[in-house]
């Protein structure tokens, strides 16, 4: 993973091009990402930088974390995130990054935690087809049906698509276009939708793929 930014999902809107074309965009608020630690191969076994963003009351920060922030001379943030980099020596503890890291037209990958839906059935979770509404079917309209064979193998295979917990998992959307960068207000406008609820933390990194 290359260096990226941690932001917060604000919601969706749309903007218009000069030709009057409507583009749906997701607004991501990017507060300054401050470097709290630089990890190197010699000391930690790999190159990475650790960043924080946002604000947290000092009364809500425990002593070990307070000491970690104080060592970096950085105000406590709402969390810590890490980005692996090729050359950690290029970064300094206490330095910061903002939305100007990206530019309009650039492709980015966006990671977030999808909305949790709780325990859901196979129809909603895996797009299973429903069974007959009538014609002798009185109870099994939305059940998933058979889950395997008979005595051989006599068990249900792992990862069988069945009812279960839906959502609340890490999701990455690749190659989204940065439509606009509002450096003054610290906003990124990304084309299309991104995972997570409004107010959720989002990680934006340069796209891995070139298409």
UniProtKB/Swiss-Prot annotation:
Transmembrane segments: none annotated. GO terms for molecular function: rRNA binding; structural constituent of ribosome. InterPro entries: Ribosomal_uL3 (IPR000597), Ribosomal_uL3_bac/org-type (IPR019927), Ribosomal_uL3_CS (IPR019926), Transl_B-barrel_sf (IPR009000). Methylated by PrmB. One of its GO terms (biological process) is translation. One of its GO terms (cellular component) is cytosolic large ribosomal subunit. The modification N5-methylglutamine is found at residue 151. Keywords: Methylation, Ribonucleoprotein, Ribosomal protein, RNA-binding, rRNA-binding. It holds the Pfam family Ribosomal_L3. One of the primary rRNA binding proteins, it binds directly near the 3'-end of the 23S rRNA, where it nucleates assembly of the 50S subunit. NCBIfam families: L3_bact. HAMAP family: Ribosomal_uL3_B. Belongs to the universal ribosomal protein uL3 family. Part of the 50S ribosomal subunit. Forms a cluster with proteins L14 and L19. This is Large ribosomal subunit protein uL3. The lineage of its organism: Bacteria, Pseudomonadati, Pseudomonadota, Gammaproteobacteria, Thiotrichales. The gene is rplC.
């Amino acid at each position: 993973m290359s260096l990226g930014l941690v932001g917060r999902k604000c919601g969706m809107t749309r903007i218009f091009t000069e030709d009057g074309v409507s583009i749906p965009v997701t607004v991501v608020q990017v507060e300054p990402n401050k470097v709290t630690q630089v990890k190197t191969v010699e000391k930690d076994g790999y190159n990475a930088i650790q960043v924080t963003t946002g604000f947290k009351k000092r009364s809500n920060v425990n002593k070990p974390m307070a000491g970690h922030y104080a060592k970096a001379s950085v105000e406590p943030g709402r969390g810590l995130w890490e980005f692996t980099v090729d050359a950690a020596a290029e970064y300094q503890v206490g330095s910061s990054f903002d939305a100007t890291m990206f530019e309009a037209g650039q492709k980015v990958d966006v990671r977030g935690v999808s909305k949790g839906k709780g325990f859901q059935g196979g129809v909603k979770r895996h797009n299973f087809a429903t069974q007959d509404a009538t014609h002798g079917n009185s109870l099994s309209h939305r059940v998933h049906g058979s889950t395997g064979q008979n005595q051989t193998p006599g068990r249900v295979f792992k990862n069988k698509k069945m009812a279960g917990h839906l959502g609340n998992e890490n999701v990455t959307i690749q190659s989204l276009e940065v439509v606009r960068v509002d450096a003054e207000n610290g906003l990124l406008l990304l084309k299309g939708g991104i995972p997570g609820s409004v107010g959720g933390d989002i990680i934006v990194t340069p796209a891995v793929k070139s298409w």
